[in-house]
């Protein structure tokens, strides 16, 4: 019987040819084939004749000249320029690439494995139901308690008391519209019990119009306006004359003009409900009459200024 040694294989396969074959093939490769040379030269001559006699346009003519030269020079070109042979086992043997930073790659692999393991553990924990329901409820209570404290520290607009509403009204009067940082200062008056958003919502619900109507000074001016006898006499004169409202012209006294100017100084343009306050400060005059009188005074001032210049 014949015994075969498995450690020593009989056939050895080589990816590259032996040195004797390579030397012979290199010599053959250096000598070009006559048939191949004749075919390439004939093709180059045909293309060259076509480029000179049949194609007069410039791009086609230049392309044909380039093709004819390539067919003529191609067989005599070295293999290093034309790419050499593409058969398996020919050419230079490539050296194996050197792997740098092996330690860094190992660390990256370990970190990826750890992250995958953590994700798998987290998914298994979420999938499994809790064993002790009481423990879960206790934990949820512990988590909910600080939230309830925080929510208690900052109340909503529903829990406002009458005293807090009065404080809000006073703060809104103290800090009028247009003042920088108005709502922050108003909210700070409550000692952190309400956020600025809740204060703004509550102020919108109440309405600044009602707040300003509750002012004692405004009420005094309105009562003075209603009880002014000059207003009653003026209405009687207008009704007796029977003229239209557009045709009649209101008469302003010096005291009313002074009161109007003082009101304009007291309530600047940035103040809320400016003209209502000005009309309340001038007895017997409406908002439209005050606005009209201001325009008349401006025109008179400009007309008196032009002749002086």
UniProtKB/Swiss-Prot annotation:
GO terms for molecular function: DNA binding; Hsp70 protein binding; ribosome binding. The keyword Endoplasmic reticulum applies. It holds the Pfam family Myb_DNA-binding_2. GO terms for cellular component: endoplasmic reticulum; endoplasmic reticulum membrane; nucleus; plasma membrane. Residues 1-34, 84-309 are cytoplasmic. InterPro entries: Homeodomain-like_sf, SANT/Myb, Zuotin/DnaJC2. Residues 123-137 have a biased composition (Polar residues). Keywords: DNA-binding, Endoplasmic reticulum, Membrane, Nucleus, Repeat, Transcription, Transcription regulation, Transmembrane, Transmembrane helix. Gene3D superfamilies: Homeodomain-like. It is found in: Endoplasmic reticulum membrane; Nucleus. The chain crosses the membrane at residues 35-55, 63-83. One of its GO terms (biological process) is 'de novo' cotranslational protein folding. Residues 97-113 have a biased composition (Basic and acidic residues). Residues 56-62 are lumenal. Residues 156-209, 244-298 form the Myb-like domain. Residues 97-142, 228-249 are annotated as: Disordered. Induction: Induced by auxin. It comes from the Eukaryota. It is a multi-pass membrane protein. PANTHER family: DNAJ HOMOLOG SUBFAMILY C MEMBER 2, TRANSCRIPTION FACTOR MAMYB. Transcription factor involved in the regulation of root hair development, possibly through auxin signaling. Its endoplasmic reticulum membrane localization is not compatible with its transcription factor activity in the nucleus. May be cleaved to target the nucleus. This is Transcription factor MAMYB. It comes from Arabidopsis thaliana. The lineage of its organism: Eukaryota, Viridiplantae, Streptophyta, Embryophyta, Tracheophyta.
